[in-house]
A protein has these predicted regions:
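N-terminal localization/anchoring segments of enzymes in phospholipid and broader phosphate metabolism
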Residues: 1-202
């Protein structure tokens, strides 16, 4: 074989890579309606809003903060806020496990949506991969919006992004917050799962 003529195996590899890369295109961006928080005036009309207004009137110039340092108390408070919400629930979490606590809280969100509460859930795709089916089912509900934070271009080919865009590997969404009726919130260091709420077996 003369020099300068590519070996047939090399040509085959180049052709195969070209075909594979041609298939690596992103799906079209879906048109979604704009989602906004409820106005402060509307939030004040909810039971949570009334309760907060009463406390603010009783303690002018101050804000209310309560430390939730017990795991079980934190889960009870999260559940109570979800059940008390009448208009909106906004949640952002880095990790959401598919265990008892995680499943119970997802069920509470679905129940809230059935009451007519608009639920918006943002989770990090790295910490929720085992929940794909559950999150897809929730997102199909007319009152629930589920969004995944994922800095990679291709969700099912992360290894390719790890190799070609390693700087994105550590871009994660570490928020941990639940906001009810745009008025009361629980935030801190706890993700959603049995190990965070003291309900692990053993």
């Amino acid at each position: 074989m003369s020099e300068g003529v590519p070996h047939p195996t090399r040509l085959l590899v180049v052709a195969l890579v070209a075909v594979l890369l041609a298939g690596c295109v992103l799906p079209p961006v879906q048109d979604r309606p704009t989602s906004t928080a409820i106005a402060t005036e509307q939030a004040r009309l909810t039971p949570i809003g009334h309760a907060v207004e009463q406390q603010l009137d009783a303690h002018p110039g101050k804000v209310g903060i309560h430390l939730l340092d017990e795991p079980a108390t934190t889960f009870a408070a999260l559940t109570h806020l979800v059940r008390s919400a009448q208009r909106t629930l906004d949640l952002q979490y880095y990790i959401w496990y598919r265990d008892r606590s995680g499943t119970l809280l997802l069920r509470e969100l679905l129940d809230a949506a059935e009451r007519g509460v608009r639920v918006r859930l943002l989770v990090d795709d790295q910490g929720t991969r085992q929940l794909d089916a559950e999150l897809a089912a929730l997102d199909a509900h007319p009152h629930i919006e589920v969004r995944l934070f994922n800095p990679f271009l291709a969700r099912n080919a992360r290894w390719l992004d790890f190799i070609t865009r390693f700087e994105r590997a550590n871009r994660r969404m570490h928020n941990k917050v639940l906001i009810a009726d745009n008025t009361a919130l629980i935030s801190g260091g706890r993700n959603v799962g049995d190990s965070y709420f003291g309900t692990t077996e053993g």
